[in-house]
Amino acid sequence: MGEIKAKINYGKLKELIQNMSKSYSVKVGVLAGHGAEETTESGINYAELGAIQEFGCDIKITQKMAAYLAITAKELGLPKLQAKGDGYVHIPSRSFLRMPLTTKNRVVKELKKQLDADEDAIIAYIAKNADFMTLAVMLGVSAKEVVLRAFETDGFGQWKANSPYTIARKGSAKPLQDTGSLWQKIAYEVNQDGK
């Protein structure tokens, strides 16, 4: 997927964070070693599922798929699907990584809010112990929380609603919520090499 960088300019922490970023990096998302390679019920892995949801995709409808969709629609009591359209199933982008982590710099604001109350104590602790890992972990936890909040709030109200067919099939109108397995694969990791 892509790389998102956040520039933090926060008083006394500025120099501390610049030093930390030279030796630590934080990743958040559907990560290798954290379930990304596991297979979903549909036969794709969670990294692929995450990419489909993050960026959207168009899937060409085959004859076999058209028959399945027609039978499923009938079983669900939906009107017969018409042979109109462009011959594709369109899955809209429902960004659970880029949008939450870049919109109004939510991660930075969340980290700042967590640090506000104890800024001097945190700086003293990290300076005394040279423990940049603590700050990197705090950033990772905050980023993961923001991403998970996107799942809870339908992308902060920005995700496209499910189609009537999808609602009938899933039994729910909430996007990305049928099994919860994708959001359960969201993880963060801190790497000490700065990459």
Protein language model features and the residues they cover:
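Short, Lys/Arg-rich flexible segments
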Residues: 1-195
